[in-house]
Protein backbone atom coordinates (compact mmCIF):
# COMPACT_ATOMS: atom_id res chain seq x y z
CA UNK A 1 0.00 0.00 0.00
CA UNK A 2 1.41 3.34 -1.07
CA UNK A 3 -1.29 5.64 0.25
CA UNK A 4 -4.27 5.01 2.51
CA UNK A 5 -6.96 6.38 0.22
CA UNK A 6 -7.70 6.79 -3.45
CA UNK A 7 -7.59 10.19 -5.15
CA UNK A 8 -8.48 11.19 -8.71
CA UNK A 9 -5.01 12.74 -9.07
CA UNK A 10 -3.20 9.48 -8.28
CA UNK A 11 -0.80 8.20 -10.97
CA UNK A 12 -2.56 5.79 -13.32
CA UNK A 13 -0.80 2.68 -11.94
CA UNK A 14 -2.00 3.34 -8.39
CA UNK A 15 -5.38 1.71 -7.81
CA UNK A 16 -7.08 2.03 -4.45
CA UNK A 17 -3.88 3.33 -2.90
CA UNK A 18 -1.89 0.31 -4.10
CA UNK A 19 0.59 -0.43 -6.86
CA UNK A 20 0.34 -3.81 -8.55
CA UNK A 21 3.77 -5.38 -8.65
CA UNK A 22 4.31 -8.25 -11.10
CA UNK A 23 5.23 -11.58 -9.51
CA UNK A 24 8.63 -11.68 -11.23
CA UNK A 25 9.74 -8.38 -9.69
CA UNK A 26 12.89 -8.66 -7.63
CA UNK A 27 13.95 -5.87 -5.30
CA UNK A 28 17.62 -5.07 -5.12
CA UNK A 29 18.63 -2.66 -2.42
CA UNK A 30 21.59 -1.75 -0.35
CA UNK A 31 22.08 -1.63 3.37
CA UNK A 32 25.29 -0.13 4.60
CA UNK A 33 26.67 -1.71 7.72
CA UNK A 34 29.35 0.76 8.69
CA UNK A 35 30.27 2.99 11.62
CA UNK A 36 27.02 4.94 11.20
CA UNK A 37 24.85 1.81 11.41
CA UNK A 38 25.04 -0.27 14.57
CA UNK A 39 23.37 -3.37 13.16
CA UNK A 40 20.80 -4.65 10.70
CA UNK A 41 17.82 -6.30 12.37
CA UNK A 42 17.32 -10.07 12.41
CA UNK A 43 14.02 -9.64 10.61
CA UNK A 44 15.81 -8.15 7.60
CA UNK A 45 18.47 -10.89 7.54
CA UNK A 46 15.80 -13.58 7.88
CA UNK A 47 13.64 -12.39 4.99
CA UNK A 48 16.22 -11.54 2.34
CA UNK A 49 19.10 -13.16 0.53
CA UNK A 50 22.18 -11.07 1.10
CA UNK A 51 25.22 -10.60 -1.07
CA UNK A 52 28.26 -9.28 0.74
CA UNK A 53 31.15 -7.79 -1.14
CA UNK A 54 34.02 -8.44 1.22
CA UNK A 55 36.77 -8.28 -1.38
CA UNK A 56 37.72 -5.67 -3.94
CA UNK A 57 36.30 -6.28 -7.39
CA UNK A 58 38.57 -6.18 -10.41
CA UNK A 59 37.48 -5.27 -13.94
CA UNK A 60 37.48 -7.99 -16.56
CA UNK A 61 36.68 -8.37 -20.23
CA UNK A 62 33.95 -10.62 -21.52
CA UNK A 63 31.93 -10.91 -24.71
CA UNK A 64 28.76 -8.82 -24.82
CA UNK A 65 25.68 -10.95 -24.22
CA UNK A 66 22.24 -10.12 -25.50
CA UNK A 67 19.22 -10.01 -23.21
CA UNK A 68 17.37 -13.20 -22.43
CA UNK A 69 13.72 -13.06 -21.51
CA UNK A 70 12.34 -15.87 -19.40
CA UNK A 71 8.71 -15.73 -18.34
CA UNK A 72 8.18 -16.03 -14.60
CA UNK A 73 6.17 -19.23 -15.10
CA UNK A 74 9.18 -20.87 -16.79
CA UNK A 75 11.55 -19.64 -14.07
CA UNK A 76 9.21 -20.94 -11.36
CA UNK A 77 8.94 -24.28 -13.18
CA UNK A 78 12.75 -24.55 -13.21
CA UNK A 79 12.86 -23.75 -9.48
CA UNK A 80 10.10 -26.28 -8.77
CA UNK A 81 12.00 -28.94 -10.73
CA UNK A 82 15.03 -28.58 -8.46
CA UNK A 83 13.22 -29.50 -5.21
CA UNK A 84 12.56 -33.16 -6.03
CA UNK A 85 15.63 -33.47 -8.26
CA UNK A 86 18.16 -32.15 -5.70
CA UNK A 87 16.58 -32.38 -2.24
CA UNK A 88 18.72 -31.57 0.78
CA UNK A 89 19.82 -34.93 2.19
CA UNK A 90 18.40 -36.02 5.52
CA UNK A 91 21.96 -36.50 6.77
CA UNK A 92 22.72 -32.84 6.07
CA UNK A 93 19.44 -31.71 7.67
CA UNK A 94 20.29 -33.76 10.77
CA UNK A 95 23.80 -32.27 10.94
CA UNK A 96 22.36 -28.79 10.48
CA UNK A 97 20.02 -29.56 13.40
CA UNK A 98 23.07 -30.42 15.53
CA UNK A 99 24.68 -27.15 14.45
CA UNK A 100 21.49 -25.30 15.41
CA UNK A 101 21.52 -26.90 18.88
CA UNK A 102 25.19 -25.94 19.31
CA UNK A 103 24.56 -22.31 18.30
CA UNK A 104 21.57 -22.08 20.65
CA UNK A 105 23.59 -23.51 23.55
CA UNK A 106 26.76 -21.46 23.01
CA UNK A 107 25.43 -18.19 21.56
CA UNK A 108 21.72 -18.19 22.45
CA UNK A 109 20.76 -17.66 18.81
CA UNK A 110 18.17 -19.87 17.13
CA UNK A 111 17.87 -20.42 13.38
CA UNK A 112 14.09 -20.52 13.30
CA UNK A 113 11.67 -22.24 10.96
CA UNK A 114 11.85 -19.51 8.30
CA UNK A 115 15.57 -20.12 7.74
CA UNK A 116 15.08 -23.91 7.58
CA UNK A 117 12.30 -23.41 5.02
CA UNK A 118 14.55 -21.11 2.97
CA UNK A 119 17.41 -23.61 3.21
CA UNK A 120 15.21 -26.41 1.86
CA UNK A 121 14.14 -24.23 -1.08
CA UNK A 122 17.43 -22.46 -1.78
CA UNK A 123 19.90 -25.36 -1.64
CA UNK A 124 18.21 -27.51 -4.34
CA UNK A 125 18.15 -24.49 -6.67
CA UNK A 126 21.79 -23.75 -5.82
CA UNK A 127 22.70 -27.36 -6.69
CA UNK A 128 20.60 -27.15 -9.87
CA UNK A 129 22.70 -24.14 -10.90
CA UNK A 130 25.91 -26.16 -10.50
CA UNK A 131 26.80 -25.64 -6.84
CA UNK A 132 27.16 -28.28 -4.16
CA UNK A 133 24.80 -29.03 -1.30
CA UNK A 134 27.35 -28.10 1.37
CA UNK A 135 28.35 -24.87 -0.37
CA UNK A 136 24.67 -23.90 -0.45
CA UNK A 137 24.33 -24.70 3.26
CA UNK A 138 27.53 -22.72 3.94
CA UNK A 139 26.05 -19.71 2.11
CA UNK A 140 22.83 -19.83 4.17
CA UNK A 141 24.65 -20.46 7.47
CA UNK A 142 27.14 -17.63 6.92
CA UNK A 143 24.71 -15.05 5.55
CA UNK A 144 21.69 -15.86 7.70
CA UNK A 145 23.11 -17.02 11.02
CA UNK A 146 26.72 -15.89 11.37
CA UNK A 147 25.82 -12.35 10.28
CA UNK A 148 23.69 -12.14 13.43
CA UNK A 149 26.88 -12.64 15.46
CA UNK A 150 27.96 -9.09 14.59
CA UNK A 151 25.54 -7.81 17.25
CA UNK A 152 27.12 -10.04 19.93
CA UNK A 153 30.05 -9.05 22.13
CA UNK A 154 32.61 -11.16 20.28
CA UNK A 155 35.41 -10.22 22.68
CA UNK A 156 33.79 -12.48 25.29
CA UNK A 157 32.99 -15.30 22.86
CA UNK A 158 36.38 -16.15 21.34
CA UNK A 159 36.52 -19.64 22.86
CA UNK A 160 32.97 -20.35 21.70
CA UNK A 161 33.86 -19.21 18.17
CA UNK A 162 36.84 -21.57 18.14
CA UNK A 163 34.52 -24.35 19.32
CA UNK A 164 32.13 -23.45 16.49
CA UNK A 165 34.90 -23.97 13.95
CA UNK A 166 35.63 -27.36 15.54
CA UNK A 167 31.93 -28.25 15.38
CA UNK A 168 31.71 -27.30 11.69
CA UNK A 169 34.79 -29.44 10.99
CA UNK A 170 33.38 -32.37 12.98
CA UNK A 171 29.97 -32.25 11.30
CA UNK A 172 30.90 -31.39 7.72
CA UNK A 173 34.68 -31.82 7.37
CA UNK A 174 37.54 -29.34 7.69
CA UNK A 175 37.57 -28.73 3.94
CA UNK A 176 33.92 -27.58 3.90
CA UNK A 177 32.16 -24.32 4.86
CA UNK A 178 34.89 -21.95 3.60
CA UNK A 179 32.62 -18.90 3.87
CA UNK A 180 31.81 -19.69 7.51
CA UNK A 181 35.46 -20.37 8.35
CA UNK A 182 36.52 -17.05 6.80
CA UNK A 183 33.75 -15.15 8.57
CA UNK A 184 34.54 -16.65 11.99
CA UNK A 185 38.31 -16.20 11.55
CA UNK A 186 37.76 -12.55 10.58
CA UNK A 187 35.68 -12.02 13.72
CA UNK A 188 38.42 -13.59 15.83
CA UNK A 189 41.10 -11.41 14.21
CA UNK A 190 39.15 -8.18 14.61
CA UNK A 191 38.24 -8.64 18.27
Stretches found by the model and what they are:
Residues 1-191:
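C-terminal regulatory/interaction module of P-loop NTP-utilizing enzymes
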Amino acid sequence: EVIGSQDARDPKLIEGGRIKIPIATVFFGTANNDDSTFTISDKVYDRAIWLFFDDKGYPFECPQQGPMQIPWSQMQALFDECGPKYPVSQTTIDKFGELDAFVIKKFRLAFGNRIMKQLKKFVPIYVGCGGTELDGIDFIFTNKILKKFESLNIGFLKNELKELIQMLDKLFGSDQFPMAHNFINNMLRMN
